[in-house]
């Protein structure tokens, strides 16, 4: 999987084709790899490589970590501010604990810490460390009973990004959003909260149905 993610991007740049050539063998694919069609992040790296002229491996291993690792810490900081308000000591302790857990979280190749520090260019690494926490943060902003409708727009874009970074994002992001909608609707008893929640869940429903129909 580590090779295939970058291999797909390199193959697309060299052949000018998307999901038509097997990056392992160079043979033409007889059917679309559905898991990758619904997680087109390697194609985005290929696009950036095509536009900039920088090799996809350099983009993935050097430039992407420079963006998304600080972004992960930024989301954690914003969550800490949401929890502790202006209490700087508590926020600082939260961030120190977060950094320690990330630095010493390599107890398995499947932990979020491993994905963050070793292969953040993969969609599921971004999903676990950036987009799912971001959905929690933006969902808390957009689904409160006194929130404005325009505050749903960032949450909607975050939902679209979650769906595009990994096929698991459609499932996990949809479950997270559904739970947030249920919690905030039950606490507020307002139909407007339910309507906003349904709106931001639309990408998950559409892509989930499309995936099931194509697999059938």
Where are these regions (language model features)?
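Active-site lumenal/periplasmic loops and adjacent helix-entry segments of GT-C-fold
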Residues: 1-103, 109-121, 126, 130
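Membrane-interface alpha helices of multi-pass inner-membrane proteins
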Residues: 151-167
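Membrane-interfacial loop-to-transmembrane alpha-helix junctions, especially the N-terminal start
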Residues: 88-94, 148-155, 193-200
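Membrane-lumen/periplasm interface segments of specific transmembrane helices
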Residues: 197-216
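Perimembrane helix-loop-helix junctions
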Residues: 173-202
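Membrane-interface transmembrane helices that cradle and orient dolichyl/undecaprenyl
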Residues: 132-151
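Hydrophobic core segments of transmembrane alpha-helices in multi-pass, intramembrane catalytic enzymes
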Residues: 69, 128-136, 172, 176
């Amino acid at each position: 999987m580590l090779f295939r993610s970058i291999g797909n991007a390199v193959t697309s740049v060299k052949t000018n084709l998307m999901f038509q050539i097997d990056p392992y063998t160079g043979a033409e694919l007889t059917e679309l790899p559905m898991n990758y069609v619904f997680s087109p992040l390697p194609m985005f790296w290929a696009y950036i490589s095509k536009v900039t002229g920088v090799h996809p491996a350099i983009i993935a291993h050097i430039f992407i970590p420079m963006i998304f690792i600080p972004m992960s810490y930024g989301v954690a900081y914003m969550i800490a501010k949401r929890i502790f308000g202006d209490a700087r000591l508590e926020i600082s302790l939260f961030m120190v604990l977060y950094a320690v857990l990330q630095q010493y979280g390599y107890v398995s190749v499947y932990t979020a810490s491993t994905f963050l520090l070793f292969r953040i260019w993969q969609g599921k690494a971004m999903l676990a460390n950036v987009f799912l926490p971001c959905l929690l943060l933006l969902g808390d902003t957009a689904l409160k009973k006194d929130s404005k409708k325009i505050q749903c727009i960032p949450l909607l874009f975050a939902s679209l990004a979650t769906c595009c970074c990994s096929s698991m994002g459609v499932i996990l992001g949809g479950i997270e959003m559904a739970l947030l909608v249920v919690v905030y609707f039950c606490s507020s008893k307002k139909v407007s909260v339910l309507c906003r929640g349904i709106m931001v869940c639309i990408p998950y429903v559409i892509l989930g149905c499309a995936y099931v129909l194509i697999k059938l």
